[in-house]
């Protein structure tokens, strides 16, 4: 019959440090008269694996054969010879724990458990520690034994130890430093270092008398002398894990016999610690990880306490202040606390840790509670205190009054230790890492040492219920001190004040519980579409209803309702505390109930804000109708990752509305929109009431906020906004804001598959607009929308200017009459801008877009699509609104093969250049009208000297460009863009961040964008360009710079006029004050005023006022601009001219000569020369006439030389052959 697993009858065992074998195991069991010291040593030897069976007091029990059923020892240990490789089985040890002896590992065979719960907590702790045993042969014991044999005070080196023990020096060093870290060895300085036994260890071993170097037990008179010291010291069981059990057994024996410990306190003394040995105990000194000494909850509590006092700290500083040494010791704890929402970090290298607001509030409340004076608690019996420590059942003993006495306990009962005549309070014991408790039945039996019997399978009834340690009953059953009825309760007002600091819902529920009242949240109404619902909630406390609240989510609605209820309750509680009379409080209650009733049946003005729409949608629609831009600004983000808080506010222009906080961005935006709408509603109410309107009129006007907002002028804002957005979206917004329906219809489709043609037509409010033809459906819709927009907005603008109440269809004749009226009759111009609150730059942009839209609203579809607009506005005085005198669009340059030797092509069709050429034509027309009789109505006046004319001091010219000029003025990203602001300061702050900024740049031929000029001298030639050399045209930023030095008039008009400079420059998009001012004026004064001092009178360096539009913010539009270019000046009346920018001629099959070409402008110069009797200039060529203006020519050469000297590059001009054409004398 094979022996059952886990049992052996042979029991042979070879010790690694002993030359002989134990051929026979000693099964001497202590009888009733045996010494307790002998039993203690047997118990220790059994725990170390040196005995196969557990010793029992009081009865001799022979080793049981495996065939006997029923009774089994608690820890059947099978020890076999290591050379034979037999298995060692310890009952109760889980799988995965291995024995290690002489380098050979033997896995445990886990027996099938028979479910049995432990009878008491102390034994469960003992078994759980026993399950953590790891039996192995350690080099540490060999080294310690060798050093002990050397004698006290003697030391040796690692090299000698390696030779004596036959172990590699590397392994010896590792063990030596490990022992030194545990405090068992002492390292002496030297090379190589000397090692010896630590003084504290020797003193303890000699004083305690447990084990001497010779191997005899000092305090065991009945110890087994056959066991040599090597049998006991060179054990294969880990000392670190056995130490708690040795301490328990030693405690039991010392309590029984009164043996004095090294700390000079008797075990039975009042100051003794039954659960822990002195500080040199191996159970604590052997733990290398600092976290092993401390409970995780204790570490977290220390971290929270420290952060509560210092507000923030790094991980290293935290570790040092709570008793650790390195940051890595608490990094894992901090990360775990961050997940729980107790702390959060800022920064990365290294992070700074803070307490979260919620954790700080909880700690503050806890501290405030603890600070309340408590009644003296009842004295805790010593039995409860002692039950917190690990104990073993020991025999009863009647000793002196200061001895420990225990009652007889049965199997499965809790041992209760009675302490008699104890007057001194015992200090709080050091805390060990809590043992691991396994849920479920234990795999080890329980031994009744007093009765000397093995435990049976019978489970007592008292073990069938969950039991806690005696020390835990008080914490669970007794009511906390702050709920004690003996303590004075805080007032309702103070409680409400504390609850107000929390989440509104949590605070209200806490107050209701405090006041022993029921609190309910009732949903009254749900409205709105499924994608944007609206919820209305109401708080009911003990049947009392509070004002409801409405929001876009249930959570927010509950929070708002709770906040309203908290506000009302707080006011009532405050009134009671302030000592108001009952009548006043009753009156306030009635008043509040009336408000509640009113809130339950809200007026239409209160509900019309968000009827069927979300607050964000309603606010955006209202802002669209007002022509203002609306922005949701994220002010801050707080809180941990699992519970963030976002703070948002709404900004409309320069006005900012109150900010709100919410747990999500969507909810925060909705709440911010609600606040903005309420503020707007309040402003509208106040403004209407201030106009002395009847009360019925006010309520009727407030029935719908949207019906009030269109009363403000919005058409100008729509004009600027719609013309700078996607045409389809702009038309749909326009139609929706006016209550119309808009649609696009495919009228016709033709052409081959590789080149189809689609004819689209837009319909708005039942009215069809002109059809357009395109090569794709998308382009067709965009162009149809653009055409419809221009017709609609043009009609509205004309009606507004002329004071019409209704919009009438615009025909060619009416347009012609309107344009003539606007251009010739100053009385027809409005004196003030209809756009309330707009800035100066908004006025300039509005005039430019209005004029362009009026000219092109019924023009051909070739003008549709993305374009760049530039215009020059003239103001006759500071109060004059201004009039557009020239405008142009375009973004192309002529191709090299389209150059003309006769001046018949326009080389640069960019919007800024075209508007300036139109401005020159305007100046020619004004000069032709000038005479001494009509000088009062002219914009000119005689200059000093009388030979030339100059612009009157009150007349100013302003340039508007819908985007930044190409070249140096547009070389920045959008993050550098400046916001629009109305500033009276005209000082420039140019940006010079790197040497590349300020360089001259040329435009790309037949494309968009610019490239820098080369550093070498470049002289373009006619034949080179014709043969394929790249045609270079200076960028718009560089040309505007030249206008601010030499003037807008050019070389030819310098014969008759003084230089004319711009007063301001306004941009609609991509504006940066530092980059723009550097590009258009300030780069020539980078090194001071030396350049300006070299200019001859009347030329100066002009620094115009710069700014951007604020009533809209254009979005970036993808796709290339069209090749067409439009030019117009005030002298042309209603006549628009459309050019092909790549050819420089009029768009059409005949390639007609443009009116802004060199040839036509030179023709106007010839007419002016005849009119002013300058016959000397009539016979000159175009180039010669320009050079004849010597002052201008000198200033131009100086300007080009200055740019080169400053390192900006060479100015590149067109070939000279292009300027050598003549005209017949006029």
Swiss-Prot record:
Q: Which Pfam families match?
A: A_deamin, dsrm, z-alpha
Query: Any idea which residues bear Asymmetric dimethylarginine here?
Result: 26
Residue ranges under compositional bias (Polar residues)?
A: 600-610
Q: Which SUPFAM superfamilies match?
A: dsRNA-binding domain-like (SSF54768), Winged helix' DNA-binding domain (SSF46785)
UniProt-listed SMART domains: ADEAMc, DSRM, Zalpha
Q: Which reaction does it catalyse?
A: adenosine in double-stranded RNA + H2O + H(+) = inosine in double-stranded RNA + NH4(+)
Task: Report the residue ranges that make up the A to I editase domain in this protein.
Answer: 886-1221
> Could you tell me which residues belong to the region Interaction with Z-DNA?
133-202
Work out whether the entry's keyword set contains Cytoplasm.
yes
Tell me a GO biological process for this protein: RNA processing
Please tell me whether the keyword DNA-binding is annotated for this protein.
yes
Glycyl lysine isopeptide (Lys-Gly) (interchain with G-Cter in SUMO1) cross-link position in this chain? 418
GO molecular function ontology, one term from the record: double-stranded RNA adenosine deaminase activity
Q: How is it modified after translation?
A: Sumoylation reduces RNA-editing activity.
- What's the subunit arrangement here? Homodimer. Homodimerization is essential for its catalytic activity. Isoform 5 can form heterodimers with ADARB1/ADAR2. Isoform 1 interacts with ILF2/NF45 and ILF3/NF90. Binding to ILF3/NF90 up-regulates ILF3-mediated gene expression. Isoform 1 and isoform 5 (via DRBM 3 domain) interact with TNPO1. Isoform 5 (via DRBM domains) interacts with XPO5. Isoform 1 and isoform 5 can interact with EIF2AK2/PKR and UPF1.
Q: Which disease is it linked to?
A: Dyschromatosis symmetrica hereditaria: An autosomal dominant pigmentary genodermatosis characterized by a mixture of hyperpigmented and hypopigmented macules distributed on the face and the dorsal parts of the hands and feet, that appear in infancy or early childhood. Aicardi-Goutieres syndrome 6: A form of Aicardi-Goutieres syndrome, a genetically heterogeneous disease characterized by cerebral atrophy, leukoencephalopathy, intracranial calcifications, chronic cerebrospinal fluid (CSF) lymphocytosis, increased CSF alpha-interferon, and negative serologic investigations for common prenatal infection. Clinical features as thrombocytopenia, hepatosplenomegaly and elevated hepatic transaminases along with intermittent fever may erroneously suggest an infective process.
Function, as annotated, reads: Catalyzes the hydrolytic deamination of adenosine to inosine in double-stranded RNA (dsRNA) referred to as A-to-I RNA editing.
- What's the protein here called? Double-stranded RNA-specific adenosine deaminase
Q: Which organism is it from?
A: Homo sapiens
Gene of this entry:
ADAR
């Amino acid at each position: 019959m094979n022996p059952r697993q886990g049992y052996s009858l042979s029991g042979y065992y070879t010790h690694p440090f002993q030359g002989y074998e134990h051929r026979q195991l000693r099964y001497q069991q202590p009888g009733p008269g045996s010494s307790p010291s002998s039993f203690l040593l047997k118990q220790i030897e059994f725990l170390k694996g040196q005995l196969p069976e557990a010793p029992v007091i009081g009865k001799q029990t022979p080793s049981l054969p495996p065939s006997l059923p029923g009774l089994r020892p608690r820890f059947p240990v099978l020890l076999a010879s290591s050379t034979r490789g037999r298995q060692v089985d310890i009952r109760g040890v889980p799988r995965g724990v291995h024995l290690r002896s002489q380098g050979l590992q033997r896995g445990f065979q886990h027996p099938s458990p028979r479910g049995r719960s432990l009878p008491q907590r102390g034994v469960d702790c003992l078994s759980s520690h026993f399950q953590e045993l790891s039996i192995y042969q350690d080099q540490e014991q060999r080294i310690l034994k060798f050093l002990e044999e050397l004698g006290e005070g003697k030391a040796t080196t690692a090299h000698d130890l390696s030779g004596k023990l036959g172990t590699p020096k590397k392994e010896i060093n590792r063990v030596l430093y490990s022992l030194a870290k545990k405090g068992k060895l002492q390292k002496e300085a030297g090379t190589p270092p000397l090692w010896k036994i630590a003084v504290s260890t020797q003193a303890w071993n000699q004083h305690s008398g447990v084990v001497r170097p010779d191997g005899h037990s000092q305090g065991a008179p009945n110890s087994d002398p056959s066991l040599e010291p090597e049998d006991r010291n060179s054990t294969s069981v880990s000392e670190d894990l056995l130490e708690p059990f040795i301490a328990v057994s030693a405690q039991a024996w010392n309590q029984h016999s009164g043996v004095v410990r090294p700390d000079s306190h008797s075990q039975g003394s009042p100051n003794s610690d039954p659960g822990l040995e002195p500080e040199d105990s191996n159970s604590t000194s052997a733990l290398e990880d600092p976290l092993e000494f401390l409970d995780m909850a204790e570490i977290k509590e220390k971290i929270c306490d420290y952060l509560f006092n210092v507000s923030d700290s790094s991980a290293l500083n935290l570790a040092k202040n709570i008793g650790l040494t390195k940051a890595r010791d608490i990094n894992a704890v901090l990360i775990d606390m961050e997940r729980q929402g107790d702390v959060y970090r800022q920064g990365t290298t290294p992070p700074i840790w803070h307490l979260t607001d919620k954790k700080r509030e909880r700690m503050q409340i806890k501290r405030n509670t603890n600070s309340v004076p408590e009644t003296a608690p009842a004295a805790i019996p010593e039995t409860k205190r002692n039950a917190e420590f690990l104990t073993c059942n020991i025999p009863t003993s009647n000793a002196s009054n200061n001895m420990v006495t225990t009652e007889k306990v049965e199997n499965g009962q809790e041992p209760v230790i009675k302490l008699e005549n104890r007057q001194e309070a015992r200090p709080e014991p050091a805390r060990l890492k809590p043992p691991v408790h396994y849920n479920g039945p234990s795999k080890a039996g329980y031994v009744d040492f007093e009765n000397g019997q093995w435990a049976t399978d019978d489970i007592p009834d008292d073990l069938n219920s969950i039991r806690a340690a005696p020390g835990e009953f008080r914490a669970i059953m007794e009511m906390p001190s702050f709920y004690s009825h003996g303590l004075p309760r805080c007032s309702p007002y103070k409680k409400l004040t504390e609850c107000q600091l929390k989440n509104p819902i949590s605070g209200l529920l806490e107050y209701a519980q405090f006041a022993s009242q029921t609190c309910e949240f009732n949903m009254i109404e749900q409205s709105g579409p499924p994608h944007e619902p609206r919820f209305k909630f109401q708080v009911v406390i003990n049947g009392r209803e509070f004002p409801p609240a409405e929001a876009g989510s249930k959570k927010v609605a509950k929070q708002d309702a709770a906040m309203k209820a908290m506000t009302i309750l707080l006011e009532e509680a405050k009134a009671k505390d302030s000592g108001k009379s009952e009548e006043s409080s009753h009156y306030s209650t009635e008043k509040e109930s009336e408000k509640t009733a009113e809130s339950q049946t809200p007026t239409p003005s209160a509900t019309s804000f968000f009827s069927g729409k979300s607050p964000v949608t309603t606010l955006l629609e209202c802002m669209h109708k007002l022509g203002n831009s609306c922005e949701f600004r994220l002010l801050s983000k707080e809180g941990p990752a699992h519970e963030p808080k976002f703070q948002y506010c709404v900004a409309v222009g320069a006005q900012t509305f109150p900010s709100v906080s919410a747990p999500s961005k969507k909810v925060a935006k909705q709440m911010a929109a609600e606040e903005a709408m309420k503020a707007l509603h309040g402003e509208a109410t106040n403004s209407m009431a201030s106009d002395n309107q009847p009360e019925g009129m006010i309520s009727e006007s407030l029935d719908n906020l949207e019906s009030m907002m269109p009363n403000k002028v919005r058409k100008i804002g729509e004009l600027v906004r719609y013309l700078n957005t996607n045409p389809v979206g702009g038309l749909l917004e326009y139609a929706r804001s006016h209550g119309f329906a808009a649609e696009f219809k495919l009228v016709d489709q033709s052409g081959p598959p590789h080149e189809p043609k689609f004819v689209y037509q837009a319909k708005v409010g039942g009215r069809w607009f002109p059809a357009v033809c395109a090569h794709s459906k998308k382009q067709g819709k965009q162009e149809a929308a653009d055409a419809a927009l221009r017709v609609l907005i043009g009609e509205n603008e004309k009606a507004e200017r002329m004071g019409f109440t209704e919009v009438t269809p615009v025909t060619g004749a009416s347009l012609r009459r309107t344009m003539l009226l606007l251009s010739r009759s100053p009385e027809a111009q409005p004196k003030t801008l209809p756009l309330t609150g707009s800035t100066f730059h908004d006025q300039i942009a509005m005039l430019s877009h209005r004029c362009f839209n009026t000219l092109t609203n019924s023009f051909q579809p070739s003008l549709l699509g993305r374009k760049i607009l530039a215009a020059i506005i003239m103001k006759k005085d500071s109060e004059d609104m201004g009039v557009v005198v020239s405008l142009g669009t375009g973004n192309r340059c002529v191709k090299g093969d389209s150059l003309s030797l006769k001046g018949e092509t326009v080389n640069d069709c960019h919007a800024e250049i075209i508007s300036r050429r139109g401005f020159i034509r305007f100046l020619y027309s004004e000069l032709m009208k000038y005479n001494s009789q009509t000088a009062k109505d002219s914009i000119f006046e005689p200059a000093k000297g009388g030979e030339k004319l100059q612009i009157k001091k009150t007349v100013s010219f302003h340039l508007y460009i819908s985007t930044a000029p190409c070249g140096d003025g547009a070389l920045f990203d959008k993050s550098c863009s400046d916001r629009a602001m109305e500033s009276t300061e005209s000082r420039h702050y140019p940006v010079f961040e790197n040497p590349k900024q300020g360089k001259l740049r040329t435009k790309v031929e037949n494309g968009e964008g610019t490239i820098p000029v080369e550093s070498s001298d470049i002289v373009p030639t006619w034949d080179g360009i014709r043969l394929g050399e790249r045609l270079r045209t200076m960028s718009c930023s560089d040309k505007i710079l030249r206008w601010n030095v030499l003037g807008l008039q050019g070389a030819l008009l310098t014969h008759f006029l003084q230089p004319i400079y711009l007063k301001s420059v306004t941009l609609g998009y991509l504006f940066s004050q530092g980059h723009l001012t550097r590009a258009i004026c300030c780069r020539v004064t980078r090194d001071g005023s030396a350049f300006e001092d070299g200019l001859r009178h009347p030329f100066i360096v002009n620094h115009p006022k710069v700014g951007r539009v604020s009533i809209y913010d254009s979005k970036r539009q993808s796709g290339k601009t069209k090749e067409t270019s439009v030019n117009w000046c005030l002298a042309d009346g209603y006549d628009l001219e459309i050019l092909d920018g790549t050819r420089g001629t009029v768009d059409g099959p005949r390639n007609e000569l443009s009116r802004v070409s060199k040839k036509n402008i030179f023709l106007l110069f010839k007419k002016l020369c005849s009119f002013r009797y300058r016959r000397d200039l009539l016979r000159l060529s175009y180039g010669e006439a320009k050079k004849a203006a010597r002052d201008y020519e000198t200033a131009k050469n100086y300007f080009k030389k200055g740019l080169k000297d400053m390192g900006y590059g060479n100015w590149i001009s067109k070939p000279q052959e292009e300027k050598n054409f003549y005209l017949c004398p006029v």
